[in-house]
From Swiss-Prot:
NADP in keyword set: yes
Transmembrane segments: none
Coiled-coil intervals: none
Binding-site list for NADP(+): S209, P210, L211, G212, R213, G214, F215, F216, A217, S218, G219
Record-listed E.C. numbers: 1.1.1.-
Matching InterPro entries: Aldo-Keto_reductase, NADP_OxRdtase_dom, NADP_OxRdtase_dom_sf
Amino-acid positions noted as binding substrate in the UniProt annotation, renumbered to this chain: H130
GO MF annotation: an example: oxidoreductase activity
Enzyme class: oxidoreductase
Domain of life: Eukaryota
Source species: Arabidopsis thaliana
Family, as annotated: Belongs to the aldo/keto reductase family.
Active site: Y63 (proton donor)
UniProt-recorded name of the protein: Probable aldo-keto reductase 3
């Protein structure tokens, strides 16, 4: 049964970063999943999370774009900044309305300076490359990030949606503290190569969309209530031809959660937590009650037999549809050219 609990602390990676064992993904507070939440309500939710022990806050310069960081900046005033571990990201540019993945040194530096200004902070705790620029050797991008650490603008470096080979190459330039990847009961392809690579190198794992973008919270009926500007409407797994298949997975998880005395969302989150103390899920929400429910997932204990049952339920064939549309870059197409090919412009 899921009970109220204290949010424990974990070491993320092996460079000294300590975070709450569950974070808060802030993307949905300023759109993407429908309309933005009113600013006062969004700030109240962030403050409630921090007061509850969820101090690891995740944002990005492309959420909004930019408005999410501005919101966080307002929420962190009056001494709140010192209570949190702040993570943001760079690498997806929307200049002139066109999306472009960028990782050249000049862009890395400009993006960091802009994020510092929007967040109204002097240093970012964890700075991720949101998507990998496959035109720029990862060593070049990492070199500029290393300089930002030396200058005190960021404390730790992270990668998001990076392949195992890209992670290895990046790690030779400067230790990677965390890799952010989608990991949930319906997204498990990272278990084959990326998770073992992170563990070999002492890199923490941050799981985004641990509830399957809300699927394990609401099930297939979620689709009926999506706003027209909710980007999930375009995702393959939420298309009706795939949803009819995917709802079977939800029904099995729901039945198991009922026996367990928790919600399907809590069971799905507990499964991620049980992957190890080097894993930190960052579920997002716009409702305080859902935030409280997510925190209670930390109290759900799963036996080895229950973990095995869940993993049997959540085999790859139980999920139909890709994670993203074909145009969205992921770790599967994130390898970069060799360093020897680089000629700075």
């Amino acid at each position: 049964m899921a009970e109220s609990c204290r949010v424990r602390r974990i070491k993320l990676g092996s460079q000294g970063l300590e975070v709450s064992a569950q974070g808060l993904g802030c993307m949905g507070l300023t759109g993407h999943y429908g309309a933005s939440k009113p600013e006062t309500e969004a700030i109240a939710l962030i403050h409630h999370a921090i007061h509850s022990g969820v101090t690891f806050l995740d944002t990005s310069d492309m959420y909004g774009p930019e408005t999410n960081e501005i919101l966080l900046g307002k929420a962190l005033k009056d001494g709140v900044r010192e209570k949190v571990e702040l993570a943001t990201k760079f690498g997806i540019s929307y200049a002139e309305g066109n999306r472009e993945i960028k990782g050249d040194p000049a862009y890395v530096r400009a993006a960091c300076e802009a994020s510092l200004k929007r967040l109204d902070v002097t240093c970012i705790d964890l700075y991720y490359q949101h998507r990998i620029d496959t035109r720029v050797p990862i060593e070049i991008t990492m070199g500029e990030l290393k300089k930002l650490i030396e200058e005190g603008k960021i404390k730790y470096i992270g990668l998001s949606e990076a392949s195992a080979s890209t992670i290895r190459r990046a790690h030779t330039v400067h230790p990677i503290t965390a890799v952010q990847l989608e990991w949930s009961l319906w997204t498990r392809d990272v278990e084959e190569e990326i998770v073992p690579t992170c563990r070999e190198l002492g890199i923490g794992i941050v799981s985004y969309s641990p509830l399957g973008r809300g699927f394990f919270a609401s099930g297939p009926k979620l689709v009926e209530n999506l706003d027209n500007n909710d980007f999930r409407k375009a995702l393959p797994r939420f298309q009706q031809e795939n949803l009819d298949h995917n709802k079977i997975l939800y029904e099995k998880v729901s039945a198991m959660s009922e026996k367990k005395g928790c919600t399907p969302a809590q069971l799905a989150l507990a499964w991620v937590h049980h992957q190890g103390d080097d894993v930190c899920p960052i579920p997002g929400t716009t409702k305080i009650e859902n935030l409280n429910q997510n925190i209670r997932a930390l109290s759900v204990k799963l036996t080895p037999e229950e973990m095995s049952e869940l993993e049997t339920i959540a085999q790859p064939e139980s999920v139909k549809g890709e994670r993203y549309m074909a145009t969205v870059p992921t770790f599967k197409n994130s390898d970069t050219p060799p360093l020897s090919s680089w000629n700075a412009v």
